[in-house]
């Protein structure tokens, strides 16, 4: 178990804790995706599928939605060769959850799977990779499945042209807060580490995971 005083924003538990702040989560999504979000909700996965997905060892870090979009935000610390398959798995989790809640597949919301990586998953040096389903024969044909994958590479923050995104990626890469938004995140992180409830919850989570594995 990593000592509480050593936790940073990029640790899974701390990341999830910070992103439970709706103002921070909303601002992050607006900065990264350049969209306007009116209000965020934090839906719970249907009880019938939560145990199944958790048994697979995969849980959504941050699952939120607004009126017509759903977002899954994941922090990725270790380089994994199956990153693409993980995005597919998370996508299926969100779609099944929405269908179980009674939505017709024709009414599935536009979805964003967002991976914030502390490494370059594709080794192309880009700070940001966007993936949509495309037609190989004619790029103008749009299947309109509403599924978008956004993958950010924090190590390339210096080449990101958008100053807000660059500052956030730099914070992930170096833990150095250089603007008001990353200052706010860093403040929440530092307060959490001296918060007794946070410390108790973190310890309890680690005990549960030790018992499971």
For the regions a language model picked out, list residue spans one by one.
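Generic structural signal for hydrophobic core residues of well-folded globular domains
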Residues: 18, 32, 155, 172-175, ...
């Amino acid at each position: 178990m990593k000592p509480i005083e050593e936790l940073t924003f990029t640790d899974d538990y701390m990341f999830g804790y910070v992103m439970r702040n709706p103002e921070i989560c909303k601002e992050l999504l607006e900065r990264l995706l350049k969209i306007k979000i009116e209000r965020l909700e934090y839906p719970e996965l249907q009880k019938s599928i939560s145990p199944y997905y958790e048994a697979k060892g995969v849980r959504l870090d941050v699952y939120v939605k607004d009126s017509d979009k759903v977002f899954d935000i994941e922090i990725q610390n270790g380089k994994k060769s199956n990153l693409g398959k993980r995005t597919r798995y998370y996508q299926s989790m969100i779609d099944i959850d929405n269908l179980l809640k009674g939505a017709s597949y024709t009414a599935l919301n536009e979805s964003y799977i967002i991976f914030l990586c502390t490494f370059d998953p594709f080794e192309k040096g880009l700070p940001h990779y966007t993936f949509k389903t495309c037609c190989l024969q004619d790029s103008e044909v749009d299947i309109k499945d509403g599924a978008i994958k956004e993958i950010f590479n924090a190590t390339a923050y210096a080449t990101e042209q958008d100053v807000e995104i660059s500052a956030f990626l730099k914070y992930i890469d170096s833990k150095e807060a250089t603007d008001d938004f990353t200052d706010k995140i860093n403040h929440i992180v530092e307060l959490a580490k001296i918060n007794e409830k946070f410390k108790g919850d973190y310890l309890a989570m680690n005990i549960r995971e030790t018992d499971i594995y």
